[in-house]
Amino acid sequence: DTTDDDWEVLMGANARGVFNTIRSLLPIMAMGGSIINMGSVSGLNADPGLALYNASKAFVHGLTRSVAVDHGPKVRCNAICPGWIMTAMAGSAFAVAEDETAAKKDALARHPVGRFGVPSDIANMALWLACEESRFVTGQMFTVDGGLTAASPLNPSLF
């Protein structure tokens, strides 16, 4: 049930927006620097029912690698791939569930660290990627998800 308008909105923001930003940045980064894109665990592993979002974030990951290869050694380019980060947007995803409490409990159980992420978890990764300590890192996707993608999504109650 995806429309062309849905495609334009999602790919416009997540793909075209990142592409245009990088295209604008590269000429002024001749002396070097670090580009940090916002990917998603949904670009690494497809989430059901989110084909466009998954594809748009996979594009960001591919573009990140291409920029790293084409514009090194002076420009580094990496992406952060967040999992569940408790923001207003993430909270609204639970609000549409039949049982909001059960949905949160189920999602939380999939995080080996025992909590959802908070914005500072992502900010700390961005800080490291922006600084000189990460000077040997480029073309990588950094998953910041509390271990969400480390485990299989299989339901243990099936066994």
What is the role of each PLM region?
Residues 1-8, 107:
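Substrate-binding pocket helix/loop in short-chain dehydrogenase/reductase
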Residues 22, 56, 64:
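Active-site helix of classical SDR
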Residues 40:
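Residue(s) in the substrate-gating loop at a strand-loop-helix junction
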Residues 45, 138-159:
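Short C-terminal tail/terminal secondary-structure segment
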Residues 72-76, 81, 137-139:
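Short, small/polar-rich loop/turn modules that mediate ligand/substrate recognition or access, typified
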